[in-house]
């Protein structure tokens, strides 16, 4: 026996579980299956069931589950606190793996079996829970974004209604009231986000350092920190760039050379929140960002492509300042940029 693996298909009410093992010949065998409730009572039953089937304690065991909304979080945290090795898989990654197995049918028990096999065959990255501070900050920033999107929806409806053939004044009034309420809630959330940041003096100090960049406000930075868990899981800026979907992917085959572009296979909330700051830092002529924009735009003449490059650089500088607890200094950043460019010029 090489490894034990438990696959969990988690929904709002129940958890379908499959306990499998893989031997020296890479053959995966289902040992046991069970269904428990997605609540503390079910978690305890799950832990007992896993312990019962984990007969050879010296053999590694991993628990594999999908990131299904928020339904997996309580179970994952419970198992993590029990010192279990937990891997949380993105739904699209799990889906492609199950398709590769040639499974034509789909139900909860089949998904649990597939996840168990995935955990047995692959060396998956282990999951760590987000700290309470950044988890609550993420709840604030995501709610802010949700309300912003709702305001946009209702404003579009209001605009359409006011330009229709017959205007229903009652509905116009109702929409205006909803927009007013949401706008009030946005202001309340802004204050709550600021208060939450201030509750941690170390984070607030770093926030003030970074917000010296013209165009980067507390809300933008709070969103980046919330989505990255305060950069705690990143060992390099390259990892962060990939996480945010700013990494460049090639499109080449044989003699054919296609266009390169960013992958966008990452956290879209980070890219969304850095959209406006990228415009602002260029407009305010912040040297490191303006230089990058000018240089890239002169190469290809595409404004948005240059602004994406600015977004990426902005994220990397935020990461560096936060990790090193340094205030933003445009002169210093400009010197660092020249030092990085010079070796490449000498090499060429």
At which residue positions do the language-model features occur?
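Intrinsically disordered, low-complexity and often Lys/Arg-enriched segments
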Residues: 1-2, 25-33, 336-348
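Gly/Thr-rich phosphate-binding beta-strand-loop-beta motif of the actin/hexokinase/Hsp70
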Residues: 2-22, 115
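Nucleic-acid-processing active sites and adjacent nucleic-acid-binding tracks
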Residues: 25-57, 62
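Short, solvent-exposed helix-loop connector elements
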Residues: 54, 126-140, 171, 256-264, ...
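Acidic, metal-coordinating catalytic cores used for nucleic-acid/nucleotide bond scission
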Residues: 61-74
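Long, charge-rich intrinsically disordered scaffolds of nucleic-acid metabolism proteins
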Residues: 77, 87-209
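Phosphate-backbone recognition surface of nucleic-acid-processing proteins
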Residues: 212, 218, 224-303
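Low-complexity, acidic/Ser/Thr- and charged residue-rich accessory regions of DNA metabolism proteins
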Residues: 255-256, 293-348
């Amino acid at each position: 026996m090489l490894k034990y693996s438990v696959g969990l298909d988690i929904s709002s009410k129940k958890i379908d579980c499959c306990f499998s093992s893989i031997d020296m010949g890479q053959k995966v065998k289902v040992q046991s299956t069970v269904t428990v409730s997605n609540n503390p009572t079910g978690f305890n039953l799950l832990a007992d069931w896993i312990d019962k089937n984990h007969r050879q304690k010296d053999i590694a065991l991993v628990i594999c589950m999908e990131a299904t909304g928020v339904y997996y979080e309580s179970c994952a945290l419970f198992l993590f606190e029990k010192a279990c090795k937990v891997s949380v898989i993105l739904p699209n990654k799990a889906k492609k793996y199950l398709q590769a197995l040639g499974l034509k049918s789909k139900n909860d028990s089949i998904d649990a079996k597939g996840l168990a096999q995935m955990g047995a065959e692959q060396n998956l990255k282990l999951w760590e829970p987000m700290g309470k501070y950044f988890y609550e900050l993420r709840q604030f920033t995501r709610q802010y974004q949700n309300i912003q999107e709702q305001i946009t929806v209702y404003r579009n409806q209001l605009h359409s209604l006011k330009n229709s053939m017959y205007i229903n004044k009652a509905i116009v009034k109702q929409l205006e009231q909803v927009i007013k309420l949401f706008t009030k809630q946005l202001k309340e959330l802004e204050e709550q986000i600021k208060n939450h940041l201030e509750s941690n003096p170390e984070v607030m100090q770093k926030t003030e350092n970074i917000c010296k960049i013209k165009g980067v406000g507390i809300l933008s930075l709070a969103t980046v920190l919330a989505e990255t868990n305060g950069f705690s899981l990143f060992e390099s800026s390259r990892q962060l760039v990939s996480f945010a979907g700013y990494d460049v992917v090639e499109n080449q085959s044989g003699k054919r050379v296609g266009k390169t572009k960013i992958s966008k296979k990452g956290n879209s909330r980070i890219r969304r929140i850095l959209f406006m700051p990228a415009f602002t830092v260029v407009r305010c002529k912040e040297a490191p960002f303006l230089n990058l924009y000018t240089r890239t735009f002169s190469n290809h003449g595409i404004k948005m492509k240059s602004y994406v490059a600015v977004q990426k650089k902005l994220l990397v500088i935020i990461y560096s300042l936060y990790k090193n607890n340094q205030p933003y200094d445009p002169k210093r950043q400009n010197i660092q940029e020249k030092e990085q460019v010079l070796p490449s010029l000498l090499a060429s």
